Each structure stands twice: as structure tokens, then as C-alpha cells.
Amino acid sequence: MKLRYVVVTSVTRDDLPDGGAAHWAETVRAIRKQNPDAAIELLIPDLDARPDLLDTVIASKPDIIGHNIETVERLTPVVRSRAKYRTSLETLRHMSRQGVATKSGLMVGLGESDDEVLQTLHDLREAGVGIVTLGQ
């Protein structure tokens, strides 16, 4: 399949001891074996911001790793009942500090203020995120 750009996503796998980190890494290696020149982007859960799990994924050398912040801090408990805003930022910060191109997504139109959106964008930038997508 001569793929040039591959985006891999999944649901959160809290049912697995490593949150799926080993599977993410193996998936990247398998794609590289079949398509060595393909750019690979992952969209991963926060893996509880555990450096050991994040480093497992990072070591597989995807080109971009994304983790979506999804919403502003105030709305996180409502929009992402099992997630924590600060844990997402720590996840992104760790990946960025390891030199990985880091991406996050933010939904708008959920009742957030302009100032809250700007604060979230500032928080993402402070965490080292270089790519942000906005959706509705």
C-alpha cells in the first residue's frame, strides 16, 4: 500500500495495564516496515501522563504525536468526565520535551468564552505544542 501519510487513532484503553502504549509502538514499527517513507501521526490518550508509557510510544519514532485537550479547563469535567485538563497538558509537555512534534485539538462552541479559548491556546503553547486544530 505505498502510503505517504498515516494517522492512527484509538479509543482510550484504560483496560490495559500500559494503556496501549506497547501496541502504539508496535503499530508504528509495523507501518514503518511496510512503508518506510510514510509520515506517521498518532492521536493517543493521555496514558495518565506516565513518562514510562509515553516514552514507549516516543521510542517508536512517529513523526507527530497528538493528544487532544478537547475543551477549556472549566468545561473539562463536563465534556471529558474521566480526563483532567492538567494531565493532558503534562502529557503534551512530556512529549514536547522529548523533541517530538506535538499536536492537540480543541473543540469550540460548547459555552466557553473567548478568554478561555485564548488561555487554552496559551496553555498548549506553554506545554510546547506546535500544532493545534480547532473544531466545532
Regions picked out by a protein language model, each given a short descriptive name:
Residues 1-6, 10-135:
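Conserved AdoMet/S-adenosylmethionine-binding subsite of the radical SAM
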